[in-house]
């Protein structure tokens, strides 16, 4: 099957960075025997330095069509126009190569929907946005409903997101979660002396790293906390760490590639993230694939996969309960079977599992 995976919001091909979730799907489908190409639409503002126009290159063995049309926060209608211009340039580049997909599957945006309609190709869309975690205005809900109804299939990355999409638009989404790299994130243990918690996420308010630091400060004993990620709250969180006199026990490691994160998980005992909102929660899943039990909040995504066998679920913005959960984990870490936790994640989220589900979905769409 010829499949075009597409997504919005990318850095330049010079950095070889595209949306990791969508690229993971493209690679999994390629490995399943399909002819897969990738389309990247970049309509960020001119402030983001990058080449403009349409370029073709290869990333991890996947042919990529990258279209950059600077736009950013412009008046209503102009961003969609920029997206259409970018999509048109991608369509022309694909046609020049003499290749036509059987299915177009886009994440995060609808730029390639017009190409699908023009070429008579089924258009599949995956929703990731936390926009649905609150009630939408009638105008916004109607706008999204019209977009969804033009799709051959609409997917959501979690049950909670699908439920919220139904509440906002009445559209029934099919749940297909993100892929987790179960090769990089596999059970491995590195000996260490002190109990070690690890967390990973953008340093932004919704990840609630400040709440995690407050909860950690209330723990007894001398556990360690390692935080991976970068973002606008970095300075404030480091200042809070100093204020709470935690610098000897907390370390900030910044953004790092997957292999470094996996190595850190091998030397940790528990993953903890006190998010206020998640549509999926790939950070939790990666840690579990590495065999770590997790402490997660009931914030949308984790309810789909956190159980008594692999971790602890707590309410959002409840620092005292978070402290109690961390204390419980320190006392009862050996109750959790790392091999079983990892095996369950592999069964549900491995590349071959998700590729098989998507293949079945595409075949159903093409048979209609």
Regions found by a protein language model. Name each.
Residues 293-296:
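Short hydrophobic beta-strand element within catalytic cores of glycosyltransferases
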Residues 1-53, 363:
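N-terminal subdomain of nucleotide-sugar transferases
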Residues 276:
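Aromatic "clamp/platform" in nucleotide-sugar-dependent glycosyltransferases that forms part
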Residues 255-256, 263-268:
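Short alpha-helical donor nucleotide-sugar binding micro-motif in glycosyltransferases
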Residues 160, 179:
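Carbohydrate-associated surface elements
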Residues 14, 80-88, 103-120:
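An aromatic- and histidine-rich active-site surface loop
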Residues 4, 189-207, 213-216, 226:
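Conserved donor-binding/catalytic core segment of Leloir-type glycosyltransferases
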């Amino acid at each position: 099957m010829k499949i075009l995976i597409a997504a919005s919001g990318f850095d330049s091909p010079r950095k070889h960075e595209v949306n990791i979730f969508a690229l993971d799907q493209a690679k999994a489908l390629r490995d399943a025997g399909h002819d897969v190409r990738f389309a990247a639409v970049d309509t960020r503002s001119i402030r983001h330095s990058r080449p403009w126009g349409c370029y073709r290159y290869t990333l991890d063995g996947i042919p990529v069509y990258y279209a950059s049309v600077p736009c950013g926060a412009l008046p209503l209608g102009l961003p969609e126009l920029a997206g259409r211009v970018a999509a048109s340039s991608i369509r022309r580049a694909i046609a020049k190569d003499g290749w036509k997909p059987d299915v177009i599957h886009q994440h995060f945006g609808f730029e390639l929907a017009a190409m699908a309609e023009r070429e008579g190709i089924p258009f599949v869309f995956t929703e990731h946005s936390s926009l649905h975690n609150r009630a939408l205005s009638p105008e916004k809900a109607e706008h999204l409903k019209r977009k969804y109804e033009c799709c051959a299939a609409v997917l959501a990355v979690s049950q909670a997101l699908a439920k919220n999409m139904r509440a906002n638009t009445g559209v029934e989404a099919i749940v297909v979660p993100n892929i987790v790299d179960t090769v990089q994130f596999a059970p491995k243990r590195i000996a260490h002396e002190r109990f070690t918690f690890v967390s990973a996420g953008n340093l932004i308010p919704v990840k609630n790293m400040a709440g995690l630091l407050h909860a950690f400060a209330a723990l007894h004993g001398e556990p360690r906390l390692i935080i991976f990620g970068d973002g606008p709250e970095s300075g404030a969180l480091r200042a809070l760490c100093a204020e709470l006199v935690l610098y000897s026990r907390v370390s900030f490691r910044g953004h790092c590639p997957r292999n470094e994160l996996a190595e850190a998980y091998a030397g940790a005992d528990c993953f903890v993230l006190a998010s206020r909102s998640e549509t999926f929660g790939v950070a939790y899943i990666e840690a579990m694939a590495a065999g770590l039990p997790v402490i997660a909040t009931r914030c949308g995504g984790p309810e789909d996969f956190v159980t008594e066998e692999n971790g602890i679920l707590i309410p959002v913005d409840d620092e005292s309960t978070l402290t109690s959960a961390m204390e419980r984990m320190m006392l009862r870490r050996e109750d959790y079977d790392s091999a079983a936790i990892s095996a369950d994640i592999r069964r549900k989220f491995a590349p071959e599992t998700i590729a098989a589900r998507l293949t079945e979905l595409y075949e159903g769409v093409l048979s209609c």
